[in-house]
């Protein structure tokens, strides 16, 4: 099993939405419409632009449809409140993390299509069904990749 990298995220079509430090937005806050989207949010440390730098993904979070439309802002609130060991680590380690967003509709290369070539990926069943949850996709990510700050 390998660590997920920025290259994996870019190949799946993830977009950078901002940077955080200690559970707070660093260098500007993205618009609420961006933060309330359901999908997966990945934290990457040390995204410094060096030509051969391919940093590993530190952590992943998923956000479903919410009536309150808090989205990733709720995750940041949990980090600031230090509600888990992961949240305490992110809040206290004084590192800047780049936040990548990937909607569930683009998860196929990282879940059921992981490790397959372009042709095989085209014929791989789509992982998304009305009965499949973001939790199941999260477990598939854990089956395919390791994350620096998360054991599962």
Swiss-Prot record:
GO biological process: symbiont-mediated perturbation of host cell cycle progression; symbiont-mediated suppression of host DNA replication
Entry annotated with the keyword DNA-binding: yes
Top-level taxon of the source organism: Viruses
Pfam family, one: Phage_T4_Ndd
GO MF: DNA binding
Keyword field: DNA-binding, Host-virus interaction, Inhibition of host DNA replication by virus, Modulation of host cell cycle by virus
Nucleus keyword on record: no
Annotated InterPro entries: Phage_Ndd (IPR009514)
Task of the protein: Disorganizes the host nucleoid and inhibits replication, but without host DNA cleavage or degradation. Only the architecture of the nucleoid is affected. May act on the host chromosomal sequences that determine the structure of the nucleoid. Binds to dsDNA but not to ssDNA.
The protein's name in its UniProt record: Nucleoid disruption protein
Organism: Escherichia phage RB69 (Bacteriophage RB69)
């Amino acid at each position: 099993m390998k660590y997920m990298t920025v290259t994996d995220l870019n190949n799946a079509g993830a977009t950078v939405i901002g940077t955080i430090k200690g559970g707070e937005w660093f260098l500007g806050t993205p618009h609420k419409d961006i933060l309330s989207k359901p999908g997966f949010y990945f934290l990457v440390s040390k995204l410094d632009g060096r030509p051969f730098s391919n940093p590993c993904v530190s952590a992943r979070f998923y956000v479903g449809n919410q009536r309150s439309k808090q989205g990733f802002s709720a995750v940041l609130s949990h980090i600031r409140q230090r509600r888990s060991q992961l949240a305490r680590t992110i809040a206290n380690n004084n590192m800047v993390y780049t936040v990548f967003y990937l909607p569930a509709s683009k998860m196929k290369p990282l879940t059921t299509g992981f490790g397959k070539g372009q042709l095989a990926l085209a014929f791989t069943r789509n992982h998304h069904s009305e009965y499949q949850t973001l939790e199941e996709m999260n477990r598939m990510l854990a089956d395919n990749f390791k994350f620096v700050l998360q054991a599962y």
